[in-house]
Amino acid sequence: LLGEPVEARFGKDFPIRFDFLDTVGGGNLSVQVHPTTQFIRENFGMYYTQDESYYLLDAKEGATVYLGLKTGIDKNEMIEDLRKAQKGEIVFNTEKYVNKLPAKKHDHYLIPGGTVHCSGSEALVLEISSTPNLFTFKLWDWQRLGLDGKPRPINVERGKEVIDWKRDTEYVKQHLANHLTKISEGDGWREERTGLHPNEFIETRRHWFTKPVTHHTNNSVNVLNLIEGEEAIIESCLL
């Protein structure tokens, strides 16, 4: 099922997870950061972290994604504002510190560990990620309360240890936002790579086709998701 290269690295763990994040008619998700591989190994004994990406399945008017830090911010000031917000002393000014990007259907944003991010409102996001999902450090949750009537748990102190402060506006534009590479094309089909950051092991490819096409798994696990159209019929062929 996994293929020998994947099984050799991850054992019996299935390393890929798809989640659907629906904020259409709702609010922003929590501003958060996932730990780097080094941090999660040294502190939690795991050998890979939750790198992920956002693929926009749909986006209504005003849809946004928050990704990376604004160039030139004062990191000490940002952390202090997060601490004050956690205590209820201020409302954290997210747009002062975090890039707010307009989002449209079929956009793809890479989110390697250490990158501050969240999905904004009015978006339907396919979140493609690796599987250690217990290590999300939330930084700000827009003053929302839990079922107990108290502010939802926030982990600023852990989060500040893993934020990659070099992931600023320019870095996001150059490395994380909509980097499309054409792999190949033919009569009635086109294959594109939409994401693979050097720190990540999940490569994402997008296939457009109007007639039957053949794809090779290359001795690795492949997870498919229909992003346009009503249905696709997939048949396995043993060679």
Question: What is each model feature region?
Answer:
Residues 1-105, 118-230, 234-238:
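Active-site region of the double-stranded beta-helix
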Residues 108, 112-114:
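Glycine-rich, mobile lid/loop segments that gate access to catalytic sites or pores
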